[in-house]
């Protein structure tokens, strides 16, 4: 009898301890922002993201910043603990030799040990938000490119996906069409495609301010589920392209979007203060964490006639 009671106690203690490892089943969603290098203003991006998520109230946010020097020892010591989180927001971008420090090129990729940990995290069920220019990153890292699906690449690098005027997806093979690019930033009419949980309850279309629409994003393009699309502003082109999509990798979920352009010198840009963006980010994180998508659709969510830009993001500065 004593042994049986002891066994019951051990089972209860183990059950209580299990949520501490891997994904949490209740409580706040644990989010890790990974930053440290980009051609965009990664420092301000992190501050703005933290401000949005802390205001939402259901996220526990941490940050892991890549070393700010080129010493091998510093990089060897950098090892983000991905497994301790439900979702990783990846903001790093090494595209175009964007150095960590001024004048330092080429920009580094993550160390092999960090890459391995990241792949294992997603494969086992972790969620990843590929934030804006992180879609450009890590040319040649096969697993990362599979997760992202569509990246900033040359014309012959992979398949592109565009959307027809009737809302049908059209796959463009390598070498057909152009390399990835974008026209001038502008107020963009975003249209939903389908009825994904992230967009449930949202209008079918809305205006998003100061936005880039990437054309001819390319990659493996496997398991890509396009959630929303918009027309690019490139003169003489004006086709429809994905601006939000999801993929899967192993048991993990991945969400990619071009929302959130924060250029160097921008302060509290409209791209981040958009009511649509500040609604969709928490909803995407809920979905990535495997939770029900319950974050409310904002009363000031924009329609098709005007953008909806909020005041300064709280707690960010």
Model-derived features: where do they sit?
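An acidic, glycine-rich "communication" segment
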Residues: 130-234, 297-317
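Bacterial N-terminal signal peptides that target proteins for export
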Residues: 1-8
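Extracellular ligand-binding/catalytic regions of CAZymes and related secreted enzymes
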Residues: 24-29, 44, 55, 80-83, ...
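Boundary at the C-terminal end of the N-terminal hydrophobic targeting segment
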Residues: 20-22
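Bacterial N-terminal signal peptides
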Residues: 8-17
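Helical hinge/lid and interdomain linker segments adjacent to catalytic or ligand-binding clefts
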Residues: 28-138
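Short, solvent-exposed loop/turn segments at secondary-structure junctions
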Residues: 38-39, 94-96, 135-137, 204, ...
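Non-transmembrane alpha-helical segments in soluble domains
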Residues: 50, 119, 145, 199, ...
């Amino acid at each position: 009898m004593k042994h049986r009671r002891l066994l019951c106690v051990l089972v209860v203690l183990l059950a209580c301890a299990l949520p501490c490892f891997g994904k949490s089943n209740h409580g706040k969603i644990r989010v890790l922002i990974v930053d440290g290098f980009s051609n965009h203003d990664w420092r301000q991006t992190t501050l703005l993201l933290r401000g949005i998520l802390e205001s939402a109230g259901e996220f526990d946010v941490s940050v892991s910043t890549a070393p700010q020097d080129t010493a091998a020892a510093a990089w060897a010591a950098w090892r983000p603990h991905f497994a301790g989180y439900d979702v990783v927001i990846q903001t790093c971008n090494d595209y175009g030799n964007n150095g960590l420090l001024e004048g330092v090129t080429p920009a580094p990729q993550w160390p092999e040990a960090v890459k391995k940990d990241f792949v294992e995290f997603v494969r086992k069920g972790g969620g990843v938000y590929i934030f804006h220019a992180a879609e450009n990153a890590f040319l040649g890292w096969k697993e990362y490119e599979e997760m992202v699906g569509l990246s900033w690449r040359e014309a012959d690098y992979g398949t592109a996906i565009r959307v027809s005027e009737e809302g049908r997806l059209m796959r463009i093979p390598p070498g057909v069409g152009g390399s990835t690019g974008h026209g001038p930033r502008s107020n963009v009419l975003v249209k939903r495609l389908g009825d994904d949980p992230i967009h449930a309850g949202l209008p079918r279309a809305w205006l998003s301010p100061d936005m880039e629409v990437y054309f001819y994003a390319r990659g493996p393009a496997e398991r890509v589920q396009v959630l929303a699309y918009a027309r690019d502003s490139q003169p003489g082109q004006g086709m429809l392209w994905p601006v939000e999509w999801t993929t899967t990798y192993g048991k993990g979920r991945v969400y990619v979007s071009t929302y959130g352009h924060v250029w160097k010198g921008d302060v509290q840009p409209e791209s981040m203060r958009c009511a649509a963006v500040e609604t969709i980010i928490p909803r995407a994180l809920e979905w990535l964490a495997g939770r029900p998508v319950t974050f409310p659709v904002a009363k000031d969510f924009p329609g098709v006639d005007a953008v909806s830009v909020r005041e300064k993001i709280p707690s960010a500065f």
